[in-house]
A protein has these predicted regions:
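Short, charged recognition helix plus adjacent turn
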Residues: 2, 18, 60, 70-79
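Short, basic-rich loop-to-helix N-cap that marks the start of a DNA-contacting helix
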Residues: 45-60, 76-78
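Recognition helix of helix-turn-helix/homeodomain-like DNA-binding domains
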Residues: 30-50
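A short, Lys/Arg-rich alpha-helix, primarily the initiator
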Residues: 1-26, 56, 67
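Residues within the alpha-helical elements of helix-turn-helix
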Residues: 16, 27-32, 61
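DNA major-groove recognition helix of helix-turn-helix
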Residues: 39, 44, 54, 70-73
Length: 79
């Protein structure tokens, strides 16, 4: 089996939690952070990997460990 990528883990987590890209964007705004539609789409599609601060924001919103989200190295448990 091929190794999972950041986008694989992001998509799977969003699917498991029934969260859409627009939900993540809205949640980021509620936390006082700006996350654009294009930016989010690029993360989900695997075109780009977020900076650490953005990955921490995504992990917080999705309630997963940031290390796992970025590298797959930690448990998927709550952040």
């Amino acid at each position: 089996m091929a190794q999972e990528t950041f986008s694989d883990r992001l998509r799977q987590t969003m699917s498991d939690r029934d969260v859409r890209q627009s939900d993540v964007i809205r949640a980021s705004e509620m936390l006082g952070k700006k996350l654009g539609k294009s930016q989010m789409s690029q993360y989900v599609s695997g075109k780009t990997i977020p900076r650490r601060d953005v990955a921490e924001l995504l992990a917080r919103i999705l309630e997963v460990d940031v290390t796992w989200l970025l590298a797959g190295d930690a448990d998927q448990g709550e952040a």
